[in-house]
């Protein structure tokens, strides 16, 4: 689960990480009132959406004129921002973060996540703050610093000093080394206590006054840990989430919307990814990732159909099932019953392999439904691509 920047900074402040004075704003009148209260030489007005690249898209405004803040708020609230992370439709701005500016001497990058290779929480740092860290890693990987934290021991002072000296803080600004080490310890505490998946500050700045400030912030949470954190659950903004993904969660389905036109319904995440790959190899693009799981029932299959067909981009559906935990004839019954409940107006190809696959294929063949049954994965992918008119 993602949260807005103002929410991330609120968490930072709770855990002793320095942030600019700022406030969530939802109207020009509130912007005027807060600007008068903030009374700072520089005002920063930032659109709040769950996507990066806001600055390049015109979603961050800076002014020294207190009277101009309300006008900037009016300009941004309701605006649709299109960034490299939003897709072509963009995201509408419903709220802002208005905060004080800062005297920047140096920008750094800092994040904390779980390293998939080691399974340990790992700090990622760089002197190239304010840039896309993926670009830094691709073009100048030597500027990426990693410090793994043994979860059995937890964060230790030497971990923070390792990062500080690798960044060259002893040369840049020795006065911030101790506050930096303390801040890393606080970020680690936030990460562990709140079951975060990512904590990111980009940029973390050293000010001309020789202090540290988290100028931008991002926190993502592990969905599996949300039940333990009611305060985090309350931060959820459904306006920022894909409606079909919300519906899928309500039906215990793992669904991610994509940009293609072939809807996929698969059991198992690995098979789902392989299915998307083979659709692309056959000359088309998947419209989604949809994993119905090992306990697929008539109800979950029907819910999956409803979700797929609500996507106007879907021109065909490919059901790819390997019967291990779930038997293929059960899936076949689910498809047949779901097709009666949900009008399927696009081509449908079903591939069943594994436990009771023959029985499942027979049921589908005798159902009278307008569908194609395939035995081979490549054959099935070619069929659905051809039926949707997108053969390579």
Segments from the language model and where they lie:
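Short amphipathic alpha-helix used as the core "switch/output" element in two-component signaling
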Residues: 336-337
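ATP-dependent carboxylate/acyl-activation modules
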Residues: 1-201, 205-319, 329-331, 340, ...
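Short internal beta-strands
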Residues: 345-354
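Catalytic core of bacterial c-di-GMP phosphodiesterases, primarily the EAL and HD-GYP domains
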Residues: 324
